[in-house]
């Protein structure tokens, strides 16, 4: 009871903002697996639209509450899905080869056959593109069949694509916090 009272007291000055309703779910929204969940798709769709990008990259997290169909999406819900200290959104140009390298590197952190080389985490979430993954293959051969979902065209290694994402570890990332962008 004391802890519940303390939490209520701390949240009280922020209640109007955190209880603000942003929308309502049509389906189950979650972030629970090693690969994309439906909340990841929502975040990636917002990145694609608001940053006018072909491909979206979002960090692989498995936190935040799962919402049932018909539940309200509040600002607090969104904050729980995007709660990190480096939330800024970027928009940049990347080659198909570099995008594949990112996916391969993260996949190796997860699926390396040597458990001492597995660094944990989750697969980077993607929007606007599809790919196949074979976790039994060695690094460099796990990711294949990369395609742009809007057109169905194959992602070419030498071609440049417009990519939006967030949670960059690069210093000086300029752009709005992801929670502001998704709230639109």
Predicted features by range, described:
Residues 2-74:
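Hard-cation-handling environments
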Residues 1-17, 110-118, 122-125:
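Active-site-adjacent helix-turn-beta-strand microarchitecture at beta-sheet edges
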């Amino acid at each position: 009871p004391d802890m519940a009272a303390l939490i209520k007291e701390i949240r009280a000055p922020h209640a109007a903002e955190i209880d603000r309703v942003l929308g309502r779910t049509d389906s189950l929204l979650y972030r629970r697996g090693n690969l994309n969940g439906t909340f990841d798709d929502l975040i990636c769709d917002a990145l694609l639209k608001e940053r006018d990008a072909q491909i979206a990259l979002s960090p692989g997290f498995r936190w935040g509450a799962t919402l049932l169909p018909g539940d309200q999406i509040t600002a607090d819900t969104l904050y729980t899905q995007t709660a990190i200290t480096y939330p800024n959104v970027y928009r940049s140009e990347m080659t198909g080869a570099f995008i594949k390298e990112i996916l391969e590197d993260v996949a190796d952190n997860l699926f390396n056959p040597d458990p001492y080389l597995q660094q944990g985490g989750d697969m980077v979430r993607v929007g606007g593109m599809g790919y196949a993954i074979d976790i039994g293959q060695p690094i460099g051969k796990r990711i294949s069949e990369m395609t742009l979902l809007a057109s169905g065209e194959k992602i070419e290694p030498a071609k440049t694509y417009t990519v939006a994402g967030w949670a960059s570890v690069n210093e000086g990332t300029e752009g709005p916090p992801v929670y502001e962008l998704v709230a639109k």
